[in-house]
Design a protein with these regions (language model features):
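Short beta-strand segments
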Residues: 8-9, 88-92, 116-117
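Conserved beta-strand edge residues that scaffold enzyme active sites
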Residues: 34, 92-93, 120
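N-terminal glycine-rich anion-binding loop in soluble enzyme alpha/beta folds
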Residues: 5-65
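Mixed-charge interfacial surface used for oligomerization/domain docking
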Residues: 3, 12-20, 26, 31, ...
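Class I S-adenosyl-L-methionine
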Residues: 38-88, 93-108
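Short beta->alpha junction loops
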Residues: 65, 117-119
């Protein structure tokens, strides 16, 4: 379909491939680096390959954000079918310099580009992109698409149960959470994303994996309005069994409007490490 407004995001969005295709969303890949080997997220390495390597590779991986030129190429691709405007929604500017690259590219591009800071990542970003896409499907213009994304952003609830603090402390952009969690290394950390600032903060940790997964579930449903239709994603870093068990429980206890489980992009897995499980979503 020829849309008047093109949609662009980055590869931390974790949006299922079928939705990317259905809504014609252009994705700008980030890069994960092991030593001197660089891999484009979603193209050169799969999440499963990444998490297996993460456990054994002596090099702690790093990530590289897209350049402004990468975004210009994405804008060109996204507008090939005739779109006159572009809406770009990306990972929190407090977690990555991707937002700055997208803005610089917008200034370089010949057509109008609006860039939104999602104040989030993974499906905390992805649900915003999907909301904008569905508004476009319903006939909404750029302003309506932006408003839909912003409403979802403000309602987003996103908790992550970590199996270890090791990867988080090695190099994530998480502000004061590292200092707090470093003092309690022997526990299983629980963290969450603050949608108003786009930063990560610590919640109450647990002394066991079972305990932190229980806290993950309880904290998420404490902060979301379960009386309204809910859109939920269960995310995991190669911990599908635990994630699927949570999905089954959510379906039984709450019957959300939408729910699915997916593995997390390597770009975020660099910081959260193997075994992490998250619940992310919003209520209408």
């Amino acid at each position: 379909m020829a849309y008047k407004v093109a949609l662009v995001t980055d590869s931390t969005c974790d949006i299922p491939k079928e939705w990317l295709e259905k809504y014609e969303i252009t994705v700008v890949p980030m890069t994960v680096i092991f030593g001197d080997q660089a891999y484009m997220d979603g193209r050169d390495i799969t999440p499963l390959e990444f998490y297996e390597r993460l456990k054994t590779d002596p090099h702690h991986p790093t990530t590289s954000q897209p350049t402004p030129e990468d975004f210009v190429k994405a804008y060109e691709k996204a507008t090939e079918s005739g779109a006159e405007e572009v809406l770009t929604i990306v990972i929190s500017s407090q977690m990555s310099g991707t937002y700055d690259s997208a803005v610089r590219a917008a200034q370089m591009f010949e057509k109008s580009v609006q860039v939104l800071d999602s104040h989030n990542n993974s499906m905390g970003l992805g649900w915003q992109v999907i909301a904008a896409a569905r508004t476009r499907e319903a006939g909404g213009d750029l302003a309506a698409m932006m408003e839909s994304a912003k409403k979802v952003s403000a309602k987003m609830v996103y908790y992550v149960a970590l199996d270890t603090i090791e990867y988080l402390s090695k190099g994530g952009r998480i502000g004061g959470a590292v200092k707090f969690l470093d003092s309690i290394l022997k526990v299983k950390p629980l963290i969450y994303v603050k949608p108003e600032t786009g930063t990560v903060a610590p919640a109450l940790p647990s002394r066991s994996r079972a305990g932190v997964l229980k806290s993950l579930y309880n904290e998420f449903f404490k902060h979301i309005d379960t009386s309204k239709p809910m859109h939920i994603t269960i995310l995991h870093n190669n911990a599908e069994k635990d994630a699927k068990a949570i999905e089954a429980r959510v379906r039984e206890e709450y019957s959300p409007l939408e729910i699915f489980t997916t593995i997390v992009t390597p770009i975020l897995g660099v910081h959260t490490g193997p075994g992490a499980v998250a619940i992310c979503g919003y209520a209408e």
